[in-house]
Regions:
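A structural signal for short loop-to-beta-strand junctions that line the ligand-binding cleft
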Residues: 28-64, 93-94, 198-208, 284-290
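Extracytoplasmic/periplasmic solute-binding protein
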Residues: 43-51, 57, 81-130, 173
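Glycine-centered hinge/linker elements that transmit conformational signals in sensory
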Residues: 84, 126-157
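C-terminal capping/gating helix-and-loop segments adjacent to ligand/active sites or protein-protein/ligand interfaces
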Residues: 259, 272-328
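Short, solvent-exposed loop/beta-turn-alpha elements that line the ligand-binding surface or hinge
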Residues: 20-33, 72, 99, 115-140, ...
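Hinge/lid segment of periplasmic solute-binding proteins
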Residues: 3-57, 81, 107-109
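Extracytoplasmic/periplasmic substrate-recognition and gating elements
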Residues: 64, 68-69, 143, 150, ...
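Ligand-binding "clamshell"
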Residues: 10-18, 45, 92, 114-115, ...
């Protein structure tokens, strides 16, 4: 299982099998948004089969806790802090967070998208444009991101993401910024979407979508029967049956467009609608926090800089910008 820019790195080494004949026979170009199929290709040839789509920019909330606190679900960051204040006054932890660098980075990604918008996100966190990384918008993103920390609890450092989700499930906390793998925790606890928990786009990101697509690449093999088995597997992975069963179990959605969604829950239906809409509007964007947007060396360095800022009280947003801009040069 290789994904994102790592696919290009492996393909460059010449070890991945070309899947063009399967892709052509199965019409992958028509069944996938271009931004996704481009990631599955190297020099114009398919080298991977996409399995699913996880949406990263979600906010999960406990509606009962919100109601008791007299708070309303936020649609932008100003409203987020108003809700957080109300939750804090009601004696609950406003934001369930696990202080691990990838969770900090996941939060940062949603703040960057919500404060800066899709074009800013693309320039700063996909193209790593130096001017955008040091812009006034980036400073506002970092200031907003750091403010979120004020509404997390002191036991957050080192906490696993699923334990943070459990805090929202049991009413200890009001909300969590996390990708749609969090949904599996709610469902496993017997909770019903729209009733016991709510899934809304992270503040300010309703018209945008950061994706994390898992994919399978096949290594080049010499043997005919094995090559055929690889092709059959690739075709099956993109087939409607696998796409439905796999994603119903994983909490993600089918990557294949125009799939019937009647067996899926409301969160998945929203995710699919937004996936299709943003693929047309240009706001379907690769997740930097989940290995989809930039080479792994740059991702790791930026992630470390973001966490350092989150964890260092004395560091200013300007210092963090310099560190992130320097980190972006790591290729």
């Amino acid at each position: 299982q290789i994904k994102g820019p790592s696919l290009q790195e492996w393909a460059h080494e010449g070890v991945l099998a070309n899947m063009d004949d399967v892709a052509k026979a199965e019409h992958w170009d028509e069944l996938l948004p271009k931004v996704v199929s481009d990631i599955m290709k190297y020099q114009g040839h398919y080298i991977a089969a996409p399995v699913n789509v996880h949406r990263v920019n979600w906010l999960w909330a406990n509606p009962e806790v919100f109601q008791k606190a007299g708070a309303k679900l936020p649609t932008n960051w100003d409203e987020f802090f108003v809700a957080a204040e109300a939750l804090k006054k009601a004696g609950v932890i406003p934001v369930a967070h696990g202080g691990q660098n990838w969770q900090d980075f996941t939060t940062f990604e949603s703040v960057a998208l919500g404060v800066g918008g899709p074009d800013f996100y693309k320039k700063a966190l996909v193209q790593l444009d130096p001017a955008t990384l040091k812009s006034a918008t980036m400073e506002k993103v970092l200031t907003t991101f750091k403010k979120v920390k004020d509404y997390t609890d002191k036991n957050a450092p080192g906490r696993d993401w699923n334990l943070a989700t459990a805090m929202v499930i049991n009413g200890q906390a009001g909300m969590q910024l996390m990708g749609d793998w969090a949904k599996g925790e709610f469902l496993a606890a017997g909770k019903v979407p729209g009733k016991d928990f709510v899934c809304v786009a992270a503040p300010g990101t309703a018209k945008a979508y950061t994706f994390n697509v898992d994919s399978f690449a096949m290594f080049k093999l010499k043997d005919g029967p094995n090559q055929q088995a690889q092709k059959d597997l690739a075709a099956a992975i993109m087939g409607p049956q696998f796409q439905e069963v796999f994603n119903l179990n994983k909490g993600s959605i089918p990557v294949r467009l125009n799939m019937p969604m009647d067996k899926f829950d409301d969160c998945a239906k929203t995710s699919t609608k937004d996936f299709v809409d943003t693929s047309k509007s240009g706001a379907l964007l690769p997740s930097i926090a989940h290995g989809m947007a930039v080479p792994s060396a740059a991702e790791g360095a930026i992630k470390d800089a973001v966490s350092q800022f989150w964890n260092t009280d004395k560091m200013t947003a300007k210092d963090a910008m310099d560190k992130i801009a320097a980190a972006a040069k790591m290729h």
